[in-house]
């Protein structure tokens, strides 16, 4: 690779060529952002915002049968210690300001998972005067988990999709 003319060559191709050459010698070429994203996916701390029946299924993910902590996903009680907020259940107009306040207390980068039909779009109570038709009207949502209520497996799948999304996208500047 030394002495080769790489003018106009895509950055990714150069990185792959250097990686191939250095891997034989026991080195790994990466960026600081990739290392930070890798570490962040292995230590996601989620906080519950359980509003209805979906919260029961959300609790199941921490129990021995599903054990979300084996994926590096652990619950936290404080929004200031959390990376992920899981909104589970029917969000009412009266509860919406509290949701936004808790979201604003979370440190950057922060992620939101909308769990269940009610959090995704109002669900069964969609046409009620007191229900917000989706928590994405109050906070930006990264992952939607469908179902009424979604199973613990569906939530685990959503959490793993969030880990993949974090690895795929840069999170230093959001």
Swiss-Prot record:
Cofactor note: Binds 1 [4Fe-4S] cluster.
Summary of the function given for this chain in its UniProt record: NDH-1 shuttles electrons from NADH, via FMN and iron-sulfur (Fe-S) centers, to quinones in the respiratory chain. Couples the redox reaction to proton translocation (for every two electrons transferred, four hydrogen ions are translocated across the cytoplasmic membrane), and thus conserves the redox energy in a proton gradient.
Subunit structure: NDH-1 is composed of 14 different subunits. Subunits NuoB, C, D, E, F, and G constitute the peripheral sector of the complex.
Enzyme class: translocase
Topology with respect to the bilayer: Peripheral membrane protein
Gene behind the chain: nuoB
Name of the protein in question: NADH-quinone oxidoreductase subunit B
UniProt keyword list: 4Fe-4S, Cell inner membrane, Cell membrane, Iron, Iron-sulfur, Membrane, Metal-binding, NAD, Quinone, Translocase, Transport, Ubiquinone
NCBIfam families reported in the protein's UniProt record: nuoB_fam (TIGR01957), PRK06411.1 (NF005012)
């Amino acid at each position: 690779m030394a002495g080769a003319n790489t003018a106009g060559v895509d950055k990714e191709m150069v990185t792959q060529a250097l990686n191939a050459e250095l891997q034989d010698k026991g080195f790994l070429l990466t960026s600081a952002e990739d290392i930070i994203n890798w570490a962040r996916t292995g230590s996601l701390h989620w906080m519950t915002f359980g509003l209805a029946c979906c919260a029961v299924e959300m609790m199941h993910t921490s129990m021995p049968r599903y054990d979300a902590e084996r994926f590096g996903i652990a619950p936290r009680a404080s929004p200031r210690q959390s990376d992920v907020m899981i909104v589970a259940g029917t969000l009412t107009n009266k509860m919406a300001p509290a949701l936004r306040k808790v979201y604003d207390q979370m440190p950057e980068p922060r992620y939101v998972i909308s769990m269940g039909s009610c959090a995704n779009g109002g669900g069964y109570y969609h046409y009620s005067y007191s229900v917000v038709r989706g928590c994405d009207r109050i906070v930006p949502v990264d992952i939607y988990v469908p179902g009424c209520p979604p199973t613990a497996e569906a939530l685990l799948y959503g959490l793993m999709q969030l880990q993949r999304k974090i690895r795929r996208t840069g999170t230093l500047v959001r």
